[in-house]
């Protein structure tokens, strides 16, 4: 499979899953609704935030707009870099796959920010409507990002003997995220874990090219 095919399939499939899961949550749950699907530690918990990963916020209004604009600029540069890596014979398929995941993560949350405020009604105390007659809940570029995956694997009071945090409530994993967030995390993790392999291949090929052209 070519690097171009890997990139296209990764982007299309991951983006469809991201948006399908968000739209499903918006059209079937109210903000704050939750249900468990694996014991008590794997849950779908519907929340919306102003745009940062894992449920974190960057403020509303101007701050929200600037975050969206920054993401659009980042997507441009990631797309350009990815296209260069696809053309570069020295780059590995694994690196292209990881970059594609990072691009999906950025694009997925941009779609929420740009469009969701216009195409959905609000979800507070009600299930949202798609294309409401009265209009959406926010202006263009001011939509909220939909998060839903919640894994509170451990929740409890830490033992007193633990320095600084002993006796305090602790929750792991407390962040609520979506498929786009997961794509960014996995993409970055792949690059960090296999960076020596990815960039060693490029360095080796550079040396071979130099040796063959004295």
Regions found by a protein language model. Give the residues of each.
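Alpha-helical transmembrane bundles and membrane-interface segments of multipass inner-membrane proteins
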Residues: 1-214
């Amino acid at each position: 499979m070519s690097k171009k095919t890997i990139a296209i399939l990764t982007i299309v499939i991951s983006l469809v899953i991201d948006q399908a899961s968000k739209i499903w949550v918006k059209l079937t749950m109210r903000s704050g609704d939750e249900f468990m699907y694996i014991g008590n530690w794997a849950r779908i918990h519907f929340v919306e935030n102003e745009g940062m990963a894992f449920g974190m916020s960057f403020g509303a209004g101007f701050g929200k707009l600037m975050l969206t604009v920054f993401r659009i600029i980042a997507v441009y540069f990631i797309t350009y870099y990815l296209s260069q890596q696809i053309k570069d014979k020295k780059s590995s398929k694994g690196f292209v796959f990881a970059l594609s995941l990072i691009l999906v993560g950025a694009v997925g949350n941009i779609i929420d920010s740009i469009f969701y405020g216009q195409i959905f009604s609000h979800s507070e105390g009600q299930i949202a409507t798609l294309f409401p007659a009265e209009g959406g809940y926010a202006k263009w570029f001011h939509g909220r990002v939909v998060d839903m995956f919640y894994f509170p694997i451990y929740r409890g009071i830490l033992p007193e003997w633990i320095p600084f945090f002993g006796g305090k409530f602790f929750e792991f994993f407390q962040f609520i995220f979506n498929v786009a967030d997961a794509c960014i995390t996995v993409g970055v993790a792949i690059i960090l874990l296999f960076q020596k392999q990815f960039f060693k291949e490029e360095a080796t090929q550079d040396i071979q090219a130099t040796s063959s052209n004295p």
